[in-house]
């Protein structure tokens, strides 16, 4: 086993993990409870964050995708969730529910937390703009 397991993580993965942490912190500040991070179903996909939102009458299981974009010329971070990516997330969420039947009666929602770096006049990156899109897309009948 390597002395420093972090060496096995690519710089892009390390950066993505930082944005996932920012998103997890933000969502928890909004009252959601984190129950899983980077949940994977081999050969199917990965869900960045799985959280529970407690309501007065019901609980919602939230599957959150975290995205970061550097340039707006290609659309913001939220626009980067293609139909193909949506299908992959939905399929992975179905596997999550099979592995965790304790959440079978929860309503489910797919959210996206996006971070977009604005480029200023100097060409330097400016502070990130973040967005939380609740119910970013719908899944066909479960």
Swiss-Prot record:
Transmembrane segments: none annotated. GO terms for molecular function: nucleic acid binding. SUPFAM superfamilies: Restriction endonuclease-like. Signal peptide: none annotated. It comes from the Bacteria. Pfam families: UPF0102 (PF02021). Belongs to the UPF0102 family. PANTHER family: UPF0102 PROTEIN YRAN. This is UPF0102 protein PsycPRwf_0497.
């Amino acid at each position: 086993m390597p002395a420093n397991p972090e060496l096995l993580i690519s710089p892009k993965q390390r950066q993505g993990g930082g944005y996932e942490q920012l998103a997890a912190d933000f969502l928890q500040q909004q009252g959601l409870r984190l129950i899983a991070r980077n949940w994977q179903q081999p050969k199917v996909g990965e869900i960045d964050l799985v959280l529970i939102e407690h309501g007065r009458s019901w609980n919602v299981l939230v599957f959150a995708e975290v995205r970061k974009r550097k340039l707006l010329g290609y659309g913001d971070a939220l626009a980067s969730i293609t139909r193909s990516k949506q299908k992959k997330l939905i399929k992975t969420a179905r596997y999550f529910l099979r592995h965790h039947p304790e959440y079978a009666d929860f309503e489910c929602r797919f959210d996206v937390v996006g971070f977009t770096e604005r480029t200023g006049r100097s060409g330097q990156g400016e502070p990130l703009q973040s967005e939380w899109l609740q119910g970013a897309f719908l899944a066909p009948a479960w």
